[in-house]
Each structure stands twice: as C-alpha cells, then as structure tokens.
C-alpha cells in the first residue's frame, strides 16, 4: 500500500475548542499548492480527521485534483491519537493508495513508526506538507 500523509494547512490561532479551528487564507493556498504536486495520483480512499481544518484540507485537495472520492471522516485521526491504535485501524484497509489528512504530532509519529526510522521521535511535518510511504 502507498500511504500518503498530509498535514492540514495553516490554521487560525488556538481557540477555546481546538477542533473548531479553520484554515487561514494562507493555509488554503498552501493546500492548493501541495495538491498540485499530487496531481495524477489516484487515491483509492481518503481518510480525514474530524477536526474542521483537516476536513477543509481534504475538501480542497479533492476539489483541486477533481477527485470523485468521498472523504471518510474517522474519529481516530486527532492530534493526540495513539499511533499503534491508528496502525491497527489502517490494517483493515485493503487499498493500493490511501490518503490520510490529519495533524501533528500524530502524522509525524506515524511516519516514524512505519518507517522504523525512529519510533521514539516524530518526523517533522510543516503545515500542508505531505509524505508518501510505501
């Protein structure tokens, strides 16, 4: 499986409810720019965090790339979710190309865990950055 990890674009400063933060104008442009680099990739599934900024990111990517994929919102892709629990959930997806839209520190921890680069440290991922793992 090719696993694509995409961190959401730049979001509004921290608010009372982290899950409700939205993308800034700059964040939206970051996402569109990143999506252009992914043009031509046929994603079998798109999984996304329930947080607003991640959902906005997934929607922008699908719109920019003119993907017909339905975005599947899953509750286990929040910033503090356990990487081992996430990998167990991912084992249930038998697809060739999967896009996950989420957050740090989860995505960086997932990249480190799956590559065995360093299971104790997170891989840095800036806003709207993407990593592809095979």
Where are these regions (language model features)?
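Active-site-proximal alpha-helix that buttresses catalytic centers in soluble enzyme cores
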Residues: 2-84, 107-108, 121, 125-128
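Active-site-adjacent alpha-helix immediately C-terminal to a catalytic or transition-state-stabilizing loop
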Residues: 85-134
């Amino acid at each position: 499986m090719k696993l694509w990890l995409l961190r959401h674009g730049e979001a509004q400063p921290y608010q009372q409810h982290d899950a409700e933060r939205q993308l800034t104008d700059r964040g939206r442009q970051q996402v569109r720019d990143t999506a252009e680099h992914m043009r031509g990739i046929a994603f079998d599934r798109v999984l996304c965090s329930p947080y607003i900024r991640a959902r906005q990111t997934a929607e922008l990517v699908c719109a920019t790339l003119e993907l017909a994929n339905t975005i599947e919102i899953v509750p286990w892709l929040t910033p503090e979710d356990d990487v081992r629990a996430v990998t167990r959930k991912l084992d249930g997806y038998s697809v060739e190309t999967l896009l996950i839209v989420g957050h740090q520190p989860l995505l960086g921890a997932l990249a480190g865990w799956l590559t065995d680069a360093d299971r104790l440290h997170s891989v840095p991922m800036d806003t709207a950055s993407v990593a592809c793992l095979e």
